[in-house]
Amino acid sequence: MIALYPGSFDPITLGHLDVIERASRLFSKVIVAVLKNPNKTPLFSPEQRQAQISLSTAHLKNVEVDTFSGLTVAYARQRGAKVIVRGLRVLSDFDVELQMAHTNKLLAPELETLFLATASEHSFVSSSLVKEVAKLGGPIDHLVPAPVIRDLRERFPLA
């Protein structure tokens, strides 16, 4: 069965990677789909984020990384996915994710949403937090995979 894990991943964090690794054990194929959102100004281009995720998941042979725009359910159908995977960090994530899951179910009744609770050591990590810490020159090696550390240090050189 094919699962889709969509997101902006700007950048991918160790929390995202944890969800990807766990989903890869549950499904025959996991497509990590980087959303091209015209309403956001990302730090990294969709192609850079795709490359970061590809390097970070190279050890997972059943994981594919792609980019998409538009409705997640339309992309899921196009790729033959039956499940949308979402990670939950805190209770407030659940409110937003549940609304999205209900909307997706209305638009595509054949798709299921699977929520995976993030490992406790990653429950505080967000892409926004990572960017802020990196911008201020703080340590990020416990927050993001190695390929992202390099890219963030190029973007925000240490003083």
UniProtKB/Swiss-Prot annotation:
Which parts of the sequence bind ATP?
A: S8, F9, H16, G87, L88, R89, E97, H122, S123, F124, V125, S126, S127, S128
Where are the residues marked Transition state stabilizer as a site?
H16
Q: Where in the cell is it found?
A: Cytoplasm
| One cellular-component annotation, GO | cytoplasm
**Which reaction(s) does the protein catalyse, per the Swiss-Prot or TrEMBL entry?**
(R)-4'-phosphopantetheine + ATP + H(+) = 3'-dephospho-CoA + diphosphate
Indicate the secretion signal residues. none
Q: How does it assemble?
A: Homohexamer.
Q: What is this protein called?
A: Phosphopantetheine adenylyltransferase
Tell me the organism.
Synechococcus sp. (strain JA-2-3B'a(2-13)) (Cyanobacteria bacterium Yellowstone B-Prime)
